[in-house]
Swiss-Prot record:
One example GO MF annotation: 5S rRNA binding
Protein origin, superkingdom: Bacteria
Keywords: Ribonucleoprotein, Ribosomal protein, RNA-binding, rRNA-binding
Disulfide bridges in this chain: none
One record GO biological process: translation
Taxonomic path: Bacteria, Pseudomonadati, Pseudomonadota, Gammaproteobacteria, Alteromonadales
Role summary: This is one of the proteins that binds to the 5S RNA in the ribosome where it forms part of the central protuberance.
The encoding gene: rplY
InterPro entries noted in UniProt: Rbsml_bL25/Gln-tRNA_synth_N (IPR020056), Ribosomal_bL25/Gln-tRNA_synth (IPR011035), Ribosomal_bL25_long (IPR001021), Ribosomal_bL25_short (IPR020055), Ribosomal_L25_dom (IPR029751), Ribosomal_uL5_bac-type (IPR020930)
SUPFAM superfamilies given in the database record: Ribosomal protein L25-like
Protein name: Large ribosomal subunit protein bL25
Length: 95
Protein backbone atom coordinates (compact mmCIF):
# COMPACT_ATOMS: atom_id res chain seq x y z
CA UNK A 1 0.00 0.00 0.00
CA UNK A 2 1.18 3.52 -0.74
CA UNK A 3 1.16 6.27 1.88
CA UNK A 4 1.74 9.97 1.27
CA UNK A 5 2.31 12.61 3.95
CA UNK A 6 2.40 16.37 3.34
CA UNK A 7 5.19 18.06 5.35
CA UNK A 8 7.02 21.36 5.71
CA UNK A 9 10.66 22.02 6.55
CA UNK A 10 11.23 23.07 10.17
CA UNK A 11 13.23 26.21 10.75
CA UNK A 12 13.16 26.25 14.56
CA UNK A 13 14.94 23.34 16.24
CA UNK A 14 14.90 22.44 19.93
CA UNK A 15 12.75 21.33 22.82
CA UNK A 16 10.72 24.53 23.12
CA UNK A 17 9.79 24.74 19.46
CA UNK A 18 8.95 21.01 19.38
CA UNK A 19 6.60 21.45 22.34
CA UNK A 20 4.88 24.37 20.63
CA UNK A 21 4.40 22.26 17.52
CA UNK A 22 2.92 19.37 19.51
CA UNK A 23 0.47 21.69 21.27
CA UNK A 24 -0.58 22.96 17.84
CA UNK A 25 -1.40 19.41 16.66
CA UNK A 26 1.81 18.91 14.68
CA UNK A 27 4.45 16.17 14.80
CA UNK A 28 8.15 17.06 14.54
CA UNK A 29 10.22 14.57 12.55
CA UNK A 30 13.58 14.09 10.89
CA UNK A 31 14.66 12.40 7.66
CA UNK A 32 18.23 11.12 7.58
CA UNK A 33 20.34 8.56 5.79
CA UNK A 34 23.78 7.62 4.65
CA UNK A 35 25.36 10.18 2.35
CA UNK A 36 22.51 12.68 2.61
CA UNK A 37 21.98 15.73 4.77
CA UNK A 38 19.38 15.30 7.57
CA UNK A 39 16.18 17.30 7.12
CA UNK A 40 13.95 18.40 10.02
CA UNK A 41 10.29 18.42 9.05
CA UNK A 42 6.86 18.88 10.61
CA UNK A 43 3.44 17.53 9.60
CA UNK A 44 -0.08 17.30 11.01
CA UNK A 45 -0.72 14.67 13.68
CA UNK A 46 -3.93 13.60 11.95
CA UNK A 47 -1.94 12.73 8.80
CA UNK A 48 0.02 9.97 10.52
CA UNK A 49 -2.13 8.72 13.42
CA UNK A 50 -4.44 6.65 11.21
CA UNK A 51 -1.92 5.29 8.72
CA UNK A 52 0.57 4.18 11.39
CA UNK A 53 -2.06 1.75 12.72
CA UNK A 54 -1.54 -0.40 9.60
CA UNK A 55 1.13 -3.08 9.92
CA UNK A 56 2.67 -2.36 6.51
CA UNK A 57 3.38 1.27 7.51
CA UNK A 58 6.61 0.14 9.18
CA UNK A 59 7.80 -2.06 6.29
CA UNK A 60 6.74 -0.17 3.17
CA UNK A 61 8.22 2.88 1.49
CA UNK A 62 6.34 6.08 2.29
CA UNK A 63 6.22 9.23 0.21
CA UNK A 64 6.72 12.49 2.08
CA UNK A 65 6.08 15.67 0.12
CA UNK A 66 8.44 18.24 1.67
CA UNK A 67 7.74 21.74 0.34
CA UNK A 68 6.53 20.32 -2.99
CA UNK A 69 9.36 17.77 -3.44
CA UNK A 70 8.58 14.05 -3.10
CA UNK A 71 10.96 11.98 -0.96
CA UNK A 72 10.84 8.19 -0.52
CA UNK A 73 11.38 7.15 3.12
CA UNK A 74 10.87 4.31 5.61
CA UNK A 75 9.82 4.74 9.23
CA UNK A 76 12.83 4.05 11.49
CA UNK A 77 11.61 5.02 14.98
CA UNK A 78 8.52 6.54 16.54
CA UNK A 79 8.19 8.13 19.97
CA UNK A 80 4.74 8.02 21.55
CA UNK A 81 3.21 9.73 24.55
CA UNK A 82 3.20 7.55 27.66
CA UNK A 83 -0.56 7.24 28.10
CA UNK A 84 -2.23 9.47 25.48
CA UNK A 85 -2.74 8.25 21.91
CA UNK A 86 -0.25 10.82 20.57
CA UNK A 87 2.85 10.53 18.44
CA UNK A 88 5.57 12.86 19.69
CA UNK A 89 8.38 12.38 17.14
CA UNK A 90 9.20 10.24 14.10
CA UNK A 91 12.55 9.29 12.56
CA UNK A 92 12.52 8.46 8.85
CA UNK A 93 15.34 6.97 6.76
CA UNK A 94 15.79 7.70 3.06
CA UNK A 95 14.63 4.68 1.04
Amino acid sequence: MSYTIQAQTRTEIGKGSSRRLRHAGKVPAVIYGQGKEPVSIVFDHKDIINIQANADFYTSTLTIVVDGKEVGVRAQAMQRHVFKPLIEHVDFVYA
